Amino acid sequence: METRSRKRAEATSAAPSSSSSSPPPPPSASGPTTRSKRARLSSSSSSSLAPTPPSSSTTTRSRSSRSAAAAAPMDTSTDSSGFRRGGRGNRGNNNDNSDKGKEKEHDVRIRERERERDRAREQLNMDAAAAAARSADEDDDNDSEDGNGGFMHPNMSSASSALQGLLRKLGAGLDDLLPSSGIGSASSSHLNGRMKKILSGLRAEGEEGKQVEALTQLCEMLSIGTEDSLSTFSVDSFVPVLVGLLNHESNPDIMLLAARALTHLCDVLPSSCAAVVHYGAVSCLVARLLTIEYMDLAEQSLQALKKISQEHPTACLRAGALMAVLSYLDFFSTGVQRVALSTAANMCKKLPSDASDYVMEAVPLLTNLLQYHDSKVLEYASICLTRIAEAFAPYPEKLDELCNHGLVTQAASLISTSNSGGGQASLSVSTYTGLIRLLSTCASGSPLGFRTLLLLGISSILKDILLGSGVSANASVSPALSRPADQIYEIVNLANELLPPLPEGVISLPTSTNALVKGSCQKKSSPSTSGKQEDILKISPREKLLGDQPELLQQFGLDLLPVLVQIYGSSVNGTIRHKCLSVIGKLMYFSSSEMIQSLIGDTNISSFLAGVLAWKDPQVLVPALQVAEILMEKLPETFSKVFVREGVVHAVDQLVLVGKPSHASPTDKDNDCVPGSARSRRYRRRSSNANSDGNQSEEPKNPASLTIGANHNSLDTPTASFMLRETVSSCAKAFKDKYFPSDGGDVDVGVTDDLLHLKNLCTKLTAGIDDHKVKGKGKSKASGPFLGDFSASKEEYLIGVISEILGEISKGDGVSTFEFIGSGVVAALLNYFSCGYFSKEKISELNLPKLRQEGLRRFKAFLEVALPFDGNEGKVPPMTVLIQKLQNALSSLERFPVVLSHPSRSLSGSARLSSGLSALAHPLKLRLCRASGEKTLRDYSSNIVLIDPLASLAAVEEFLWPRVQRSESALKPAAPIGNTEPGTLPSGAGVSSPSSSTPASTTRRHSSRSRSAINIGDTSKKDPVHEKGTSSSKGKGKGVMKPAQADKGPQTRSNAQKRAVLDKDTQMKPASGDSSSEDEELEISPVDIDDALVIEEDDISDDEDDDNEDVLDDSLPMCTPDKVHDVKLADSVDDDGLATSGRQMNPASGGTSGAAAARASDSIDTGIGNSYGSRGALSFAAAAMAGLGAASGRGIRGSRDLHGRTLNRSSDEPSKLIFTAAGKQLSRHLTIYQAVQRQLMLDEDDDDRFGGSDLVSSDGSRFNDIYTIMYQRPDSQVNRLSVGGASSTTPSKSTKSATTNSSVESQSHRASLLDSILQGELPCDLEKSNSTYNVLALLRVLEGLNQLCPRLRAQTLSDRFAEGKITSLDDLSTTAAKVPLDEFVNSKLTPKLARQIQDALALCSGSLPSWCYQLTRACPFLFPFQTRRQYFYSTAFGLSRALNRLQQQQGADGSGSTNEREMRIGRLQRQKVRVSRNRILDSAAKVMEMYSSQKAVLEVEYFGEVGTGLGPTLEFYTLLSHDLQKASLGMWRSSSGDKVSMQIGRDEIEDGKPSAANRDIVLAPLGLFPRPWPSTADISEGGQFHKVIEYFRLLGRVMAKALQDGRLLDVPLSTAFYKLILGQELDLHDIVLFDAELGKTLQELRVVVARKHYLEGVGGDNSSTISDLCLRGCRIEDLSLEFTLPGYPEYILRSGDEIVDITNLEEYISLVVDATVKRGVTRQIEAFRSGFNQVFDITSLQIFTPSELDYLLCGRRELWEVETLAEHIKFDHGYNAKSPAIINLLEIMGELTADQQRAFCQFVTGAPRLPPGGLAVLNPKLTIVRKHSSTSSAAANGAGASETADDDLPSVMTCANYLKLPPYSTKEIMYKKLLYAINEGQGSFDLS
């Protein structure tokens, strides 16, 4: 309905001339002589047939208005398009709010008619003569004038229509003075005649045949009509007749057709619903439903009621329609049941005060439907009940009646996680949230509901829900799978409603501004006395229940208190935090002392309060103090000590100082969201829109910023801020004086004995380190490296102190977070690990080797203490405790901001994404001004360009250059009409005056060009850009204009296009006149459009429906979805693709191709962390979003215009123009949106920006602003690196960065861990002054030690063997315990990052805060894999894929956006190729050579097969993976001829042909690793090694493309290979990862060498002992080792025939290691990396570990569990979860072996593995449907369905992950048929 209405409205607004411009004759027309009279009657809403309902006059008048508006010329005034838009919006309003909407619509139409009258009067003056002449000559053959009228035709018809509209407004039939245009009048008269004929047929009583025929014709006319074509339809004539026929009970056909006609009428003319209701149709339809004599009539009546209920729900309700639609629900099909429930939901939308009379009897029916099997019916039923409950919320007795029907029990069961595997298996997010809201309503308003919920154990249900939401206990749960913020809010709100309200004044909860101020400590009595007074006065039923059954309250607290504290700490939503505090406050107030004592055993409430008080959020400071006061009242002895230890007292001390002016600023700086008092004028101006934490709609008046509350008039002033500080300070002082009075200025009231002891230990450690460092320096000057006795003893002393520190931290009650932070432990340990150099002078290269040795010794010593060898199983290692303390400290100290664009703040979930995407659908208005002093270019500032926000500045340059260059050829586009060339206008010349051009020519020009767009900066796509001149100044000076807020209505891109030439450039500078915006709009004169800009389009609306367009992607002309590129190979065996590839690239150097170099230039060097300067907000965008050239698809890489010409030059071609804004140079790779946002951010100070100040204003009007960018020619003065930090890298640097930076910089990423520890630095540009810097640095050290633990442990054992403490080599293989990776995940930062990267506008503008990039780069372990993966997908592949990923994420939650324009924003371009199945490898080489560097998604088909889409594509990657593992390629190491199958994911199916082809597969039990090739290998083209290099380059491209497109590979790469990919260096210890035998032998040989060195160093004559050293009883010489690489005799390590002995054993080991993991594989790895970098930057993978990278690339390997299978599989089309066939299938799937599971996945999805996350994240979802028998004769022979099905095989649709399963009779037959289909169905795609 809504879509159809919208399209009709668009069709109306786009019509060049109106077919409905004639006045609407009423249906009672009898002849032409009465036309004037009928017009008068129509305008006064009178009818000769029947009384007209009151709303009909509005309807008729609006129809007339619409006719006039449609006739008005679309391109001559803003008002016409604005009027159409308003009409459309009003209709949407009517659907939601009939009465109120109609009043608003009436007012709007009155104003529009006044504007129209003025407009028509102007046109009357201009064209009266021409219009009169035209009207005299006009006749019914007007069609012929179309070709002869030229430009004059549309203008004359427009003028005529406008005159008619004016005369019609004047009334008295004067509109007949001008006849309508021929087409309109002819069609109207024909239509009128037909309507009269139909009406007479309907009235032919007694002639049922005529009536049936007339009804049939009427239904046909209404079904194909539009609102405009039926504008003359007389509702008041037809509806009474139709209602009468609806009661024609003797003829069911007549009743059915009458009901159908009414349905069509309400659909096509929504305004007619009022008349339908007025004439009593609703009661007739209800009667037809209740009798249910004819099923088709009942269904049609339902459809009609659904349409009517959308406009008039109350009328339907009063007519008894609610019970009517629900009474006989079981008789209808599922589809009709959904219609019935949808109708019921409409009727419950706005219930009147007496609704209970109509609703209550339906409640039992609706409650029973909550158990219904259909999810849509269930959803509508829950909506009905939620709306009923909300309507009855003020009436407890009515709510009790609701709850009496079992509503609460049913709803609680539905939301329970135990009910349906996570609670949302069958419920959408909105339904689930609605049910929780329903329970909240019942709990708050109904004593019975409250009691029922508590007795049901609702607290444990809520606990399970929240623990599964990823915000609490398990921080590793994917944010993508966590619940939306609004749902979490509702859950916490339900918990809040389950506790009685607090007595007034006890706790000032943050619900309103006044509560904070009035609830001061001085006015409040103590909780105990206050409670007693309340008890005496009145005890509510809730309090009585909790008093009678205190165990209910205790269980509530035990269940929810720990979860609420965790949610408060991890949520980035202010409203949720405030609600959590409300629940905690109530819980503390109503709990007894004994209860609180039991609660604090599981929850550290003191630490929580300390954190809240330190957070400095004014909305919660007073309530937190009051909660602390309650605790001190109830348990003074306990909390008087704990508050000191946990830092509550310290935080209160700081708050006392807040009231003093000198201490005001720290309060504002520390907040996580919005700094509060130090506000710039700009922020205060916009603070009414500021809402930093995404507050929910439930409390929209309460922004979670430091400008508290909703009353912006009062609290947004310095006075209010001062009052607030005074209130907080006085409360804190009162609390401190009452409970912690200070004695004579003693400042150490918060210092405990534990803290003093810890401080002393840290002082000893630091002193010892410094002393050691000084002595070491002196010693080293004399004797170089020192290993003297004093050093060893000093190390022992230091490690002893560290052991004491760890013991103090790990002891029983432990050290509080406050004490830990204040003790100096972090700095002392960092100083120890960095050998005294932390945060001190730089370490010279000369001293580095010595310090490395010392650092390694300290690491080993520390691990022995922190992670002991013989750690007790039950005891937590000290290192784990230390990490936990550090995590608590980090959560307490961090203040990293979540900077949200405005649409993302007030919304959540799909609404948040939808708002961001809809904002991006608006074009931005750009004024391009010549820079002052620039004389060589023309000025273009008199034009306004409408441009796609995601177009790049490079595209703007291509568009602008021919229009501003001074060459003669460029200055001669088509001659402008009636105006001068914009570039030659005098500085002060304006074009807004009507006299600046002749009206006729200007109007004519616009009529011909109104729907035109230009293509700018995109490839094979159209970006709507309009250009116009205005009267405003040229915008010189400030880079970004801040205009006044103009038109604030909703605006789609098509609307913007239609009104582009009509918009006014408003600026903050006052205009020359004081006219209102409406007056200014009316005075605008149309301006010229440059002919060179225009590309003719038939209709702008076509742009919206063009599926081949993609707004974001840089698809090349070849990437058209309709074409499939057949990749054909030469017949010769020579690898065509590889040869081509080799000729274009230097295979040995790792250099990139031209495309890769361009990509490297496109991606702004990620090695430069501060490329945007120290401000940082955009530095992340530069680094992670690759400059957004690649991101938006409009960078310099490969963009072409419509004709395929390259728009963007290669990186070594200089720019023709440079752009600046606010004096700062802008990179060509920035998008327009980025450039605009960058200026908005630079215009504010850091506090405003990081405070989450608005990036886009709440009403979207920021897109109506006009932004100014200056342009000038590059010259020697300005063509420098970016002044403003836009990171405009030079071409030479960019080209180099493709090879040097991507490999060298990343090589040092992990290899420099030790050096970065010694230097005491994080590998990012986080300021060292940041309070979290040291904590992050120490966490990084500990995480590195945890990863290196096995290696360091092995070195320790090696040292012991060398010293003779260990004699057996078998003892070297001891496994080392490690700290679980989950311990390193921070539960507070994880949801922050997850929330930040869900902000579509922040991603597009590159305005993610710098900490996102800094922390993911330096400390990726802080975030779980799922969050890092989402961050990776959001930043590595560009904007289109990031937005597409967000949409998929929302769609997976069942709440994805369905708006077509928004979907186009994130739609990906696809490139289809067809390849030969028999030559996969060669085809892949060619395909990747052509398409890997493009952004289009690759889809593969096969010659001679019908399969297309996802399945064949996945199989292509799988087959290619297998081909790349062939031993004949010479790429991989192979284990010696044993037949061991690979353990890591590659067990082949023994199914005939595949197994034969797989005999050549490399055997690599531990994963694939490159085969070493000597440096002397022939690199020339055609040689074997050259091919190997090209295969690795191909592998790099394939792997990157698979990651980019979300495909899975089946390549079992070894962990060591992944480490090389990630830029980590390998050494001897890594060889065991891919060759266990060789690695173990080399390690044992290394231990022998260590023993030799030890014997040489102890002194004495040990030569004989050394020569006798043995390896497992065998002398080295007897091993017969030669200087060749083991397994590769052709690889010569050293020339000569020397045998390896004990003297040269060390050299031999070094050479073998070098050949195996370094020099022998370097060129292969470089080729791989260069191929990878052609697709996207390989350094973006460094946030993953090797095992995670394998998981990301190759998917999941876990075995299925039967219990979880049903939750992640969809059953449809004949099956449900209880079907016997489904039960059998799930059992079979659970019993499959690992090999059979791989085969099953390959069969169903096309890939042998599932994506990361398994079946749960498979997209599309695995769906099982019933397959009907292929034999039709079976039924005729009497065979049963199951017997027939037993002969069939299952089949699949891999594109949709569909398994078509016949209903087999037994499980055994199903198992047999399934395996047969799996084994025989491989290798082709045919129709099933």
Swiss-Prot record:
GO terms for cellular component: plasma membrane. The active site is at residue 1855. One of its GO terms (biological process) is DNA endoreduplication. GO terms for molecular function: ubiquitin protein ligase activity; ubiquitin-protein transferase activity. Residues 1490-1888 form the HECT domain. Pathway: Protein modification; protein ubiquitination. Widely expressed. Residues 1377-1451 are annotated as: K-box. It is an enzyme of class 2 (transferase). Residues 1-10, 97-124, 1019-1029 have a biased composition (Basic and acidic residues). Disulfide bonds: none annotated. Belongs to the UPL family. K-HECT subfamily. This is E3 ubiquitin-protein ligase UPL3.
